[in-house]
A protein has these predicted regions:
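Gram-negative outer-membrane beta-barrel transporters
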Residues: 2-93
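Short, P/G- and charge-enriched loop/turn segments at secondary-structure junctions
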Residues: 4, 55-56, 98, 143-145
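Outer-membrane beta-barrel proteins
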Residues: 8, 99-101
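Residue-level preference for beta-strand/loop junctions
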Residues: 11, 31, 62, 104-106, ...
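Hydrophobic, well-ordered secondary-structure elements that form the walls
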Residues: 17, 37, 70, 81, ...
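Active-site lining segments that contact anionic ligands and/or coordinate catalytic metals
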Residues: 65, 76-78, 105-109, 119, ...
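Structural motif
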Residues: 73-74, 102, 116
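C-terminal beta-signal and adjacent terminal beta-strands/loops
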Residues: 85-92, 113-162
Length: 162
């Protein structure tokens, strides 16, 4: 049985920069597009040493992460492509009481929607388009620990308002 516990006092500092802009100034049909960008930086003064003397910070926190989204939307069609990325981070302790880290990870997602009428919409969503895998290491990057393939997930739905 494992659980996460508070690490005691620490200071977490960070900054988030966000930009969102509909591109209505462009000629048709590009005037129905838009862009959204986001960057986050976090830093903590918490530094713990593992049983083997390797430093780890806050669990599940990446120092850097960003998201980029392009979208299109008109009366009938909506489309969105998004890329999300995060730095490596301290994940958990292994059974040997060593630190497990996840390497940097990025994922591309795409979604489409078509409005047949105002009450009937078909949607297609594809997550992890590039079939990116999560990679883990133990304390130093050269010490491979695991590989988790998330596969590409495709969802299709039809929504009808009665």
């Amino acid at each position: 049985l494992q659980t996460k516990v508070n690490a005691g006092d620490t200071t977490l500092k960070g900054v988030e920069l966000a930009f969102q802009q509909p591109l209505t100034m462009l000629p048709a049909p590009f005037d129905k597009t838009g862009v959204q960008l986001n960057y986050t930086f976090t830093d903590s003064d918490l530094l713990q040493l593992t049983k083997y003397g390797y430093p780890v910070g806050l669990q599940d926190f990446s120092e850097n992460s960003y998201n980029a989204v392009l979208w299109y939307e008109d009366d009938k069609l909506e489309a969105r492509i998004a890329y999300n990325w995060r730095d490596d981070y301290y994940d958990t302790l292994t059974q040997a009481n060593a630190a497990q880290f996840q390497k940097p990870y990025g994922q591309l997602d795409v979604s489409l929607g078509y409005h047949f009428t105002k009450d009937i919409v078909a949607r297609l969503s594809v997550k992890n388009v590039q079939n990116e895998a999560e990679r883990y290491y133990q304390e130093i990057e050269e010490r491979f620990l695991g590989y988790k393939l998330n596969d590409t997930m495709v969802n299709f739905s039809i929504q009808a308002v009665l």
